[in-house]
Amino acid sequence: MFPMVTGFINYGQQTIRAARYIGQSFMITLSHANRLPVTIQYPYEKLITSERFRGRIHFEFDKCIACEVCVRACPIDLPVVDWKLETDIRKKRLLNYSIDFGICIFCGNCVEYCPTNCLSMTEEYELSTYDRHELNYNQIALGRLPISITDDYTIRTILNSPQTKEKACD
């Protein structure tokens, strides 16, 4: 008879423990009810990137001295720098500069080690194309600045919403 009583006691303890665990998880679920949604509706809303986000590389042709430090700093030797030595002034003249973003790993070493700061990382992350050859950007395509995400109308609306302002005050 005692084994049957201890079996009922164990069953009762396990039932109480399971009810407590269910109650705890339900309280956690209810605590998330007052929070703002984290998911963004991607094609209609854009992700606000962090300050140090490593997106597409921006290149300023006039600042480049064709030193090829970016090529040596790149772990995959990606930037293609074509230059010509001007014998009369004994300096290199940059002819072409290109980066293939289909191969780039966006490590940012080229930007970090550039002595003239002609390279910078932008907040542009929408680089998808149907043809991989379109991901090879020359100096003209690299020189275009993207539209800032914070200038987008939908992002400004989200940032100016009362819910976001209340969250910032807390």
Curated annotation (Swiss-Prot):
Boundaries of every 4Fe-4S ferredoxin-type domain copy: 55-84, 95-124
Keywords for this protein: 4Fe-4S, Chloroplast, Iron, Iron-sulfur, Membrane, Metal-binding, NAD, NADP, Plastid, Plastoquinone, Quinone, Repeat, Thylakoid, Translocase
Superkingdom per UniProt: Eukaryota
EC main group: translocase
Enzyme Commission numbers on file: 7.1.1.-
Cofactor: [4Fe-4S] cluster
GO function terms (MF aspect): 4 iron, 4 sulfur cluster binding; iron ion binding; NADH dehydrogenase (ubiquinone) activity; quinone binding
Gene Ontology BP annotations: photosynthesis, light reaction
Subcellular location field: Plastid, Chloroplast thylakoid membrane
Transferase in keyword set: no
Gene3D superfamilies the record matches: 3.30.70.3270
GO CC list: chloroplast thylakoid membrane
Residues that bind [4Fe-4S] cluster 1: 64, 67, 70, 114
Record's catalysed reaction(s): a plastoquinone + NADH + (n+1) H(+)(in) = a plastoquinol + NAD(+) + n H(+)(out); a plastoquinone + NADPH + (n+1) H(+)(in) = a plastoquinol + NADP(+) + n H(+)(out)
Residues where [4Fe-4S] cluster 2 binds: 74, 104, 107, 110
Keyword NAD appears in the UniProt entry: yes
Main location as per UniProt: plastid
PROSITE patterns reported for this sequence: 4FE4S_FER_1, 4FE4S_FER_2
Topological relation to the membrane, as annotated: Peripheral membrane protein
PANTHER family: NAD(P)H-QUINONE OXIDOREDUCTASE SUBUNIT I, CHLOROPLASTIC (PTHR47275:SF1)
Similarity comment text for this entry: Belongs to the complex I 23 kDa subunit family.
Subunit-structure text: NDH is composed of at least 16 different subunits, 5 of which are encoded in the nucleus.
Family annotation (NCBIfam families): ndhI, NuoI, PRK05888.1-3
Function, in words: NDH shuttles electrons from NAD(P)H:plastoquinone, via FMN and iron-sulfur (Fe-S) centers, to quinones in the photosynthetic chain and possibly in a chloroplast respiratory chain. The immediate electron acceptor for the enzyme in this species is believed to be plastoquinone. Couples the redox reaction to proton translocation, and thus conserves the redox energy in a proton gradient.
Protein name: NAD(P)H-quinone oxidoreductase subunit I, chloroplastic
